[in-house]
């Protein structure tokens, strides 16, 4: 269907797949945010309306494509799509697009994803938003790097990259 488009996702999650609580991220790891910025810079990102509203602004140096059912939704410096197909159509000239969450967006797009950039935080947080269950037998880990724990990064965490096995 969209074989011309490289579809990746990027996510940080804890040991129980928590990705959020009360429309926010329950941790602060500055090097993960740097990793996200550097990885997605210059690319399109697809995210849900709630995720955008929790961030509060379009992310600079990348196309922000917002998937929402709200036909009246508008947001400065963002493009709006009302279906997966419409979001992909907006990205047809992109080299790589990143699925940026939240939970419902990950669930909807996971079947199309070829590559996952996953920061795994070795801690358990309270949460109400989760990354979907993934059968990692269908994925090959191509990279893993331990993050540096310090005062700005107070948890053990690892950057993993997985590619779907075809």
Swiss-Prot record:
Its EC number is 1.5.1.3. One of its GO terms (cellular component) is cytosol. Residues 6-164 form the DHFR domain. The keyword Nucleotide-binding does not apply. Keywords: Antibiotic resistance, Methotrexate resistance, NADP, One-carbon metabolism, Oxidoreductase, Plasmid, Trimethoprim resistance. The keyword DNA-binding does not apply. It catalyses: (6S)-5,6,7,8-tetrahydrofolate + NADP(+) = 7,8-dihydrofolate + NADPH + H(+). Substrate binds at residues 10-12, 32, 62, 119. InterPro entries: DHFR, DHFR-like_dom_sf, DHFR_CS, DHFR_dom. SUPFAM superfamilies: Dihydrofolate reductase-like. GO terms for molecular function: dihydrofolate reductase activity; NADP binding. GO terms for biological process: dihydrofolate metabolic process; folic acid metabolic process; one-carbon metabolic process; response to antibiotic; response to methotrexate; tetrahydrofolate biosynthetic process. Pathway: Cofactor biosynthesis; tetrahydrofolate biosynthesis; 5,6,7,8-tetrahydrofolate from 7,8-dihydrofolate: step 1/1. NADP(+) binds at residues 11-12, 19-24, 48-51, 67-70, 100-105. Key enzyme in folate metabolism. Catalyzes an essential reaction for de novo glycine and purine synthesis, and for DNA precursor synthesis. This is Dihydrofolate reductase. It comes from Staphylococcus haemolyticus.
């Amino acid at each position: 269907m969209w074989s011309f488009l490289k579809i990746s996702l990027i996510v940080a999650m804890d040991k129980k797949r928590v990705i959020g609580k009360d429309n926010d991220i329950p941790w602060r790891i500055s090097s993960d945010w740097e990793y996200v910025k550097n990885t997605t810079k210059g690319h399109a990102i697809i995210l849900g309306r709630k995720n955008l509203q929790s961030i509060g602004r379009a992310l600079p140096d990348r196309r922000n494509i917002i998937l929402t059912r709200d036909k009246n939704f508008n947001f400065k410096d963002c493009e709006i799509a009302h279906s997966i197909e419409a979001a992909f159509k907006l990205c047809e000239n992109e080299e790589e697009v990143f699925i940026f969450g939240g939970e419902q967006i990950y669930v909807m797009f996971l079947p199309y994803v070829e590559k996952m950039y996953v920061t795994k935080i070795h801690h358990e947080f309270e949460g109400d938003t989760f990354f979907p269950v993934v059968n990692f037998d269908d994925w090959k880990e191509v990279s893993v790097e331990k993050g540096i724990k310090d005062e700005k990064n107070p948890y053990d965490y690892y950057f993993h990259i997985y590619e779907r096995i075809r």
